[in-house]
Amino acid sequence: MKTLFFLSVFIFLLLHLSPGKMEILLGSNGGARCDINKKSFDCYHRNGRCRFNCRKREYNNGDCSQYQSCCLPTRNL
């Protein structure tokens, strides 16, 4: 019963906390986080690596300055 309770709390937190807050909660360095355009993507550091979260797809090429390669805003056609 306790396992079910903790699992439900964990799932609730996953669904309701932003990635940065979740990283701090789980203890992964709480590294620097640089939101360039919150509506379309986030660029942040996790475990010494740079990651891009672009429309719910994560890219990891190690260079936050290259965010354009995966995170260009798209127009609605």
UniProtKB/Swiss-Prot annotation:
<feature type="disulfide bond">
    <location>
        <begin position="50"/>
        <end position="64"/>
    </location>
</feature>
<dbReference type="GO" id="GO:0005576">
    <property type="term" value="C:extracellular region"/>
</dbReference>
<keyword id="KW-0211">Defensin</keyword>
<dbReference type="InterPro" id="IPR025933">
    <property type="entry name" value="Beta_defensin_dom"/>
</dbReference>
<comment type="function">
    <text>Has antimicrobial activity.</text>
</comment>
<feature type="disulfide bond">
    <location>
        <begin position="43"/>
        <end position="70"/>
    </location>
</feature>
<feature type="disulfide bond">
    <location>
        <begin position="54"/>
        <end position="71"/>
    </location>
</feature>
<dbReference type="GO" id="GO:0042742">
    <property type="term" value="P:defense response to bacterium"/>
</dbReference>
<dbReference type="Pfam" id="PF13841">
    <property type="entry name" value="Defensin_beta_2"/>
</dbReference>
<keyword id="KW-0044">Antibiotic</keyword>
<dbReference type="GO" id="GO:0045087">
    <property type="term" value="P:innate immune response"/>
</dbReference>
<keyword id="KW-1015">Disulfide bond</keyword>
<keyword id="KW-0732">Signal</keyword>
<feature type="signal peptide">
    <location>
        <begin position="1"/>
        <end position="20"/>
    </location>
</feature>
<protein>
    <recommendedName>
        <fullName>Defensin-B6</fullName>
    </recommendedName>
</protein>
<keyword id="KW-0929">Antimicrobial</keyword>
<comment type="similarity">
    <text>Belongs to the beta-defensin family.</text>
</comment>
<keyword id="KW-0964">Secreted</keyword>
